[in-house]
């Protein structure tokens, strides 16, 4: 195979990897956790991954404790738990 063909194959494989959504087996296990507001009394708008709806949704975080299913932005949540 020529070097041009190898570059084309590499480019196609890279594109495929970027466009393939994360499956349940590839998703970090903390994405499956229910949102936890934590033990503090803050009222911070945060995002969590909802396993049932397969969407990133809003919850209110107290500011400490909780779990790792807690994101600052929907984009961060989607990239981590839903896929690109």
Swiss-Prot record:
Positions marked as site (Reactive bond for trypsin): 41-42
Q: What is its main location?
A: secreted
Which GO terms of the molecular function aspect are on file?
serine-type endopeptidase inhibitor activity; toxin activity
Q: Give the signal peptide as a residue range, or say none if absent.
A: 1-24
Q: Choose one Gene Ontology CC annotation of this protein and give it.
A: extracellular space
Expressing tissues: Expressed by the venom gland.
Sugar-modified residues: 70
Can you tell which superkingdom this protein's organism belongs to?
Eukaryota
Cystine pairs: 31-81, 40-64, 56-77
Q: What does this protein do?
A: Serine protease inhibitor that inhibits plasmin and trypsin.
Q: Which family does it belong to?
A: Belongs to the venom Kunitz-type family.
- What is the protein's given name? Kunitz-type serine protease inhibitor B3
Native source species: Daboia siamensis
